[in-house]
Amino acid sequence: YFVCGFQVVFIGVHMPSYLKDNGLTPNVATTALALIGLFNVIGTYAAGSLGQRFPKRYLLSGIYILRSVAIVVFLSTPLTPWSVYIFASVMGVLWLSTVPPTNAVVAQIFGVQYMSMLAGFVFLSHQVGSFLGVWLGGKLYDATGSYDIVWWIAVALGVFAALINLPVREGAIARPASPAGAAA
């Protein structure tokens, strides 16, 4: 979830400046952000539905690897308003689509009794990733005059997240039985 925060907040905050630096108008950037928001609704709903039918670890791995592929394609193609709009639409579908399967995996593994607290811890990692995506984006831009390094870090983190989700066991963890007569 750290990676989700890093990727989406880096893009949400720094993409407008990236586009401006590459000669595109603010209108392209605002349209891109609007498309991300629009397609996010579709992607998040679809991820929740797919997570009820397929293993969530594969769904999460797919989302993270597709984000990395989308970024690589975006960086590898000529930057035009239409390439930005296509990228924004694809990223929108993938934007917060990690939320339903991530929370579902937490509930499956740990149960729902402490779901609010556990979801809070998971969300904290998202926020730490968000901070680092924004901060590192600005820091490296100031140091190099380019966002290239951070884009590639986002790609690498997406591949890493895809790989570490694959071995996740989605069943409840084994807990020792309570001793007889112990208060619940």
Q: Residue ranges of each PLM-predicted region?
A:
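Loop-to-transmembrane helix entry/capping segments in MFS-fold secondary transporters
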Residues: 26-27, 112-122
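Interfacial helix-cap and linker-helix signal at transmembrane-aqueous boundaries
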Residues: 19-20, 50-51, 136-145
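Multi-pass alpha-helical transporter architecture, strongest
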Residues: 155-184
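Extracytoplasmic gate region of multi-pass secondary transporters
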Residues: 1-47, 99, 133
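C-terminal transmembrane helical hairpin of 12-TM major facilitator-type secondary transporters
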Residues: 10, 34-40, 46-105
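A membrane-interface helix-boundary motif in multi-pass transporters
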Residues: 139-157
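Paired intracellular helix-loop junctions of major facilitator superfamily
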Residues: 106-115, 145
